[in-house]
């Protein structure tokens, strides 16, 4: 089981955490949403729970809850800039289909 980050994603998360002034790492999860069923959730985490699995890559701790882990195993998080837009991009080998707008996915 693994969650990995690109160099640019790790740098961006570290910048966010430094600006925030505190935090254990980044929580990655999924929630029911959109036309394809699931959407990614990213948020800061100050302390993991007993049900969480913690991954570390490039100095960043990524926390995943037990329910989300089955859908996220093997995911790589990247941070990309495309024209005027920038944001995190998920490369998830478990995804079978995405909605047309890219906001949700199905495994």
Swiss-Prot record:
Q: What is this protein called?
A: Iron-binding protein IscA
* Record text on cofactor binding: Binds 2 iron ions per dimer. The dimer may bind additional iron ions.
Its needed co-factors are: Fe cation
Which InterPro entries does the record cross-reference, listed alphabetically?
A: Fe-S_cluster_asmbl/transfer (IPR050322), FeS_biogenesis (IPR000361), FeS_cluster_insertion (IPR016092), FeS_cluster_insertion_CS (IPR017870), HesB-like_dom_sf (IPR035903), IscA_proteobacteria (IPR011302)
Instruction: Please give the family membership noted in the entry.
Output: Belongs to the HesB/IscA family.
PROSITE patterns, sorted: HESB
Per UniProt, subunit arrangement is:
Homodimer; may form tetramers and higher multimers.
Disulfide bridge positions per record: none
The alphabetized UniProt keywords are: Iron, Metal-binding
Q: What does this protein do?
A: Is able to transfer iron-sulfur clusters to apo-ferredoxin. Multiple cycles of [2Fe2S] cluster formation and transfer are observed, suggesting that IscA acts catalytically. Recruits intracellular free iron so as to provide iron for the assembly of transient iron-sulfur cluster in IscU in the presence of IscS, L-cysteine and the thioredoxin reductase system TrxA/TrxB.
Q: Name one GO cellular component term.
A: cytosol
Residues annotated as binding Fe cation: 35, 99, 101
Query: Which Gene Ontology biological process is one annotated for this entry?
Result: iron-sulfur cluster assembly
Task: Provide the GO MF annotations for this entry.
Answer: 2 iron, 2 sulfur cluster binding; iron ion binding
């Amino acid at each position: 089981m693994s969650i990995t980050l690109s160099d640019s994603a790790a740098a961006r998360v570290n910048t966010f955490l430094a600006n925030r002034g505190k935090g254990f790492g980044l929580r990655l999860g999924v929630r029911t949403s959109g036309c394809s069923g699931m959407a990614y959730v990213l948020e800061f985490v100050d302390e993991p729970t007993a049900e969480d699995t913690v991954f570390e890559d490039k100095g960043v701790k990524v926390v995943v809850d037990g329910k989300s882990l089955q859908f996220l195993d093997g995911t790589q998080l990247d941070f990309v800039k495309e024209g005027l837009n920038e944001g995190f991009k998920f490369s998830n080998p478990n995804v079978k289909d995405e909605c047309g707008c890219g906001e949700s996915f199905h495994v």
